[in-house]
Amino acid sequence: MTLLALGINHKTAPVALRERVTFSPETLDKALESLLAQPMVQGGVVLSTCNRTELYLSVEEQDNLQEALIRWLCNYHGLNEEDLRKSLYWHQDNDAVSHLMRVASGLDSLVLGEPQILGQVKKAFADSSRGHLNVSELERMFQKSFSVAKRVRTETDIGASAVSVAFAACTLARQIFESLSSVTVLLVGAGETIELVARHLREHHVRKMVIANRTRERAQALAEEVGAEVIALSDIDERLKEADIIISSTASPLPIIGKGMVERALKARRNQPMLLVDIAVPRDVEPEVGKLANAYLYSVDDLQNIIQHNLAQRKAAAVQAESIVEQETSEFMAWLRAQSASETIREYRSQSEQVREELTAKALAALEQGGDAQEIMQDLARKLTNRLIHAPTKSLQQAARDGDDERLHILRNSLGLE
């Protein structure tokens, strides 16, 4: 039995290829059934995200194994083999285990240390567990990767610092305001970055969120998800005074929030401070706003400085995380080797018990026929000894004839003679 990890990711393949190799949730079961129908595949898990598609497999070793699996993947997706080979990576046993642990821990992610990948790996495992896993070693490998990812999060600072604009904006807000549960946040825009910001804020139980967007329909879906109110951009002037935090990210060519607008809001707030985070390019907030007392304006460049500092911290933490992965990989491979030995031990024990049962049955039959008990017991002990040491004796003799001192030493050691 061999453990494999093969696939493509954001480092090896462009998005044009990655989107062609993806497995949708609707087709995953059929894909796994097709994969397990391959004679060499014993069990499998498919991990498919926007940044990677990977197969984790337990397989029987055979000639042309790599070619057979690449051919299956290409046939399933209608790909040219040469196009895929250029971007495909292939990890086996120790390297496959290490790769999965690194993936689950966020060490192989586009954003170093991002936590979302662990949830994606867990979902891939759960989806594949519906009748497609089949192999205890593969299951144990995934369970181990989950515990390693948790250990990396607990023992290192890899996830402690913001390394995305959205996360950095929320981190900044949490640093300035002691608790977000008492603040009102105005989000301007409804694009991807604002979506991420809104979800981060929801996780930190912000008191109230208001989303201002040019098109109400786009903002409405996000508002329903995070429990926010939707207003038009034209309403910002009137509603700005309610906001403790303003985070803006639109595609507007001109500023949406001007100095005069903020001055009026501050006056209505009796100069209670406002945090304005402008992550738009071009800028949504006039730079002059930053000169106002009690208006704290941060631009996307300010956030990038925070991100770069935090990324350096994550890279330092990643060194410690890699050591954890290396240690845990070694422990898992030791367990895997022990599992292989366990099967041999079971076979050897079963064989010995068959010999014992056979000779004991003969001895009991002899006793029933009135034979001398002492002679029968001595005969049983002699025959049992001879049968049990027959195979090791032959191996010792053969090693001696071959002049194989190393093998002779191993045999003597295994028999407890050294």
From Swiss-Prot:
Catalytic activity: (S)-4-amino-5-oxopentanoate + tRNA(Glu) + NADP(+) = L-glutamyl-tRNA(Glu) + NADPH + H(+)
Pathway as given in its UniProt record: Porphyrin-containing compound metabolism; protoporphyrin-IX biosynthesis; 5-aminolevulinate from L-glutamyl-tRNA(Glu): step 1/2
Any one biological process term the GO annotation gives: protoporphyrinogen IX biosynthetic process from glutamate
GO molecular function, one term: glutamyl-tRNA reductase activity
Keywords: NADP, Oxidoreductase, Porphyrin biosynthesis
Residues the UniProt record annotates as site (Important for activity): 99
Top-level taxon of the source organism: Bacteria
InterPro entries: 4pyrrol_synth_GluRdtase (IPR000343), 4pyrrol_synth_GluRdtase_dimer (IPR015896), 4pyrrol_synth_GluRdtase_N (IPR015895), GluRdtase_CS (IPR018214), GluRdtase_dimer_dom_sf (IPR036453), GluRdtase_N_sf (IPR036343), NAD(P)-bd_dom_sf (IPR036291), Shikm_DH/Glu-tRNA_Rdtase (IPR006151)
Residues annotated as the enzyme's active site: 50 (nucleophile)
Binding residue positions for substrate: 49-52, 109, 114-116, 120
Record-linked SUPFAM superfamilies: Glutamyl tRNA-reductase catalytic, N-terminal domain, Glutamyl tRNA-reductase dimerization domain, NAD(P)-binding Rossmann-fold domains
Pfam families, A to Z: GlutR_dimer (PF00745), GlutR_N (PF05201), Shikimate_DH (PF01488)
PROSITE patterns the UniProt entry points to: GLUTR
EC number: 1.2.1.70
Amino-acid positions noted as binding NADP(+) in the UniProt annotation, renumbered to this chain: 189-194
Top-level EC class as recorded in UniProt: oxidoreductase
More info: During catalysis, the active site Cys acts as a nucleophile attacking the alpha-carbonyl group of tRNA-bound glutamate with the formation of a thioester intermediate between enzyme and glutamate, and the concomitant release of tRNA(Glu). The thioester intermediate is finally reduced by direct hydride transfer from NADPH, to form the product GSA.
Family to which the UniProt record says this protein belongs: Belongs to the glutamyl-tRNA reductase family.
Domain observations: Possesses an unusual extended V-shaped dimeric structure with each monomer consisting of three distinct domains arranged along a curved 'spinal' alpha-helix. The N-terminal catalytic domain specifically recognizes the glutamate moiety of the substrate. The second domain is the NADPH-binding domain, and the third C-terminal domain is responsible for dimerization.
Protein task: Catalyzes the NADPH-dependent reduction of glutamyl-tRNA(Glu) to glutamate 1-semialdehyde (GSA).
Subunit structure, as described in the record: Homodimer.
Name recorded for this polypeptide: Glutamyl-tRNA reductase
